[in-house]
Structures are given as C-alpha cells and as structure tokens.
Amino acid sequence: MSPAASSHALKHPPVKAPSEPAGVDSDFPELGVAIDRARRRGRGAQSNASGRYEAEARVAFDDGWQSLEELPPFTTSVGVDTSRKVITRNDSPDIGFDRSINPYRGCEHGCVYCFARPTHAYLGLSPGLDFESKLFVKPEAPALLEKELAATGYEPRMIAIGTNTDPYQPIERERKIMRGILEVLERAGHPVGIVTKSALVVRDIDILARMAKRNLAKVAISVTSLDPKLARSMEPRASTPPKRLEALKQLSDAGIPTTVMVAPVIPALNDSEIERILDAAAHAGVKEASYVLLRLPLEVRDLFREWLMANYPDRYRHVFTLIRDMRGGRDYDAKWGERMKGTGPMAWTIGRRFEIACDRLGLNKRRSKLTTDHFSRPKRNGDQLSLF
C-alpha cells in the first residue's frame, strides 16, 4: 500500500468533518472524511465512514509521500449473496405488502438519501460509498423463488420488488436476475408490484404486459425532480427524469398499471416541483400517484448532511429547519404511521398540495388491484402429475 493510501485505525468517534460553510448549524455532527471528488465521480455519497457495528473507523490520510489524487477511483465490484431464501417477510402496519424480494444488495444508482443504505452495515461495509460500489447479486433468486412458491402451505399475496434496492440498477442489464424472477412469477400466476428509478424496466414490457392482462403486475417509478442538475447530483446513476417519464408512457401504453412516486419530497429542495412532476406523469398516461417525505434513518442522516453541505450549503439551515418541523423537532422519526408523511403544518401543506394536484389531474380515482386467482403452485421434483 502506498503511503498516500495508508489506512489508520481510529477508535470511534470518527474524524471531525471538514470545516463548515458559513451559515451552517453549529451542531453539525462529526462525519467521515470526504473522499476526493475525482475518486468518487459518478457517486452519490461524499464519504465512506465505517458502519455502526464497526469497533474501529478507518480513514485514508495523506502522509506527504504521495498525493491522494493518485489513488484509484471507486469502481463497482460484484459479490455473490448465497442466501437460501429470497422472499423477505415484514409486518409493518404502514406499508401495503407483507413480502418482498430484492435481487441485489447495495445499489449502484447511488441515491444519497436512500433509506436502505444502513443495511450494508450488516455486511461490515460502509453505508456510504461501499453501498453503491460493493454490490451483491443473488444469482439463484429465480430458482429459490420457484422453490418457495412450491412449498406446501404457501399463501399467495402480492410480492413487492424494489422496496429496498433497485431491481433494475445497471448490473441488471447483464445479470437479468429480475427477468428470471418475472418469468417464474408469470408461470405461477403470482401478482407482483415493482418499484424502480430505471428505464430498464421497459426491457421486460413483454412479460409485464401479459401479466397485466391477468391483473398480475403493476409498476411504480420514482421521479424525484425534473431538474437535471439536482437529479444527477442526488441520483447519479439512475435514469434521467425524461427517461423515467418515457418509461412510464411506454408501460402505460402497453396496458400496465403505473404509479408515479414523488419520493422523497425534500423541503426547500424539491417540494416546489410536486405539481410539475404530477403534471408530467399524468401526461405520460399515469393514473396513480403517491409521495413520501425524506427519511433519514441511522447513517443516512449524516450522509445526506454531507451531501447537502457540499452541493447546496446555502440551503442547509433552511432544509433541516423544515425537516425538524415535520419530524417533531428531530431529524427523523421512525414512528409507524408518521415516518412516511411527517406531522405539523409543513407536512400538512405538502399533503394538501399533493391531493389537490391529484384531484385536478384525475389521479387516484381508481386503484389498480392485483389478484391471486390465477396462482398455480409450481411443481416440485417428485410431485405426481395430475391425470385430469
């Protein structure tokens, strides 16, 4: 290891953040050291601080022998997730599904606000740059899914895909794990709801259209901003806003129920775009819409604050003042029933604006409903063939 790339083990707390720009709150927390811009080009996070379960923090430092600028950029590596099950269960009372699939761990889209980032800490990796550059694929996901659907006693309900990490992130283009999963679900007549930020979803429009005709599929695409600069900064490797809107149009034209998700809504950053995003989505043929306020659990809070300081320092104080107004004076409140929409006058105003715009555009007049009536349990090895 070159001197410039030397690593130094530090007991927590982590290294203090770089000096704050004028006007930033004096209570800005201690954060990881920001990685040189050239090394993290095309990434969302500014740093790669250790996860919350690590006993020591490791940071690169320049000891004067070489320049940190000579260190290589963060490249994407892909490992294998050997999990023996692919369906994850949940009993959260404020979400509309009880099971989900995530074909990948980590997400190359690099959305700085992603609430799934803290899950990388379970792997001993950073929720920062590691989350978007050290990915894990579940190559056996389609086979595992078929096995779980075939299990005695399995009760079909809609499976949500993309609730944690995006199933159509860039590596899906070559891995095609998601397409394999859809093929299994189509054969079994099992309903699926997909959430993505990627226009790659239209690759599978053939399968989705056939499933939609049987009320087995619907797709939600998140559009966070129509401002290309803001979108590129917050979601560096996700599809551009125009491509997402075009994907919504293609899906809608194919008869696939579509939803636009205005998510996350960030006060003083993108909340002014709510009506314009809904207008554009309705023009693309979307019939349903939803929104979610910015969520900052665990390490996401500090990663978002770093990003905000680096990109919009003049808005930092205002953004967090409004966030706290909607979160009971805190940066985040994980209370069920409130974590998605927040509380207080600002949260109420955002909700009313969203509702008024949806009424004006005729959105959410009818909700698409998926069915389990077509479910046929996959045959397992050893199952007798039916004679009738």
What are these regions (language model features)?
Residues 242-249, 253, 263, 272-284:
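Internal, well-ordered alpha-helical scaffold/interface segments
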Residues 193, 259, 289-291:
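Short hydrophobic alpha-helical runs that function as membrane-insertion/retention elements
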Residues 66-105, 109-220, 224-232, 240-253:
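Conserved Radical SAM active-site core
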Residues 213-216, 257, 283-287:
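Glycine-enriched alpha-helix->loop->beta-strand junction motifs that scaffold or abut catalytic
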Residues 1-82, 88-89, 272-388:
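Auxiliary Fe-S-binding modules of radical SAM enzymes
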Residues 226-228, 235-237, 250-270, 293-296, ...:
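Conserved strand-turn element in the central/C-terminal portion of the radical SAM core barrel
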Residues 199-202, 266-275:
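Active-site glycine- and acidic-residue-rich loops that bind
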Residues 184-190, 247-257, 326-329, 353-364:
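A structural motif corresponding to the C-terminal end of an alpha-helix
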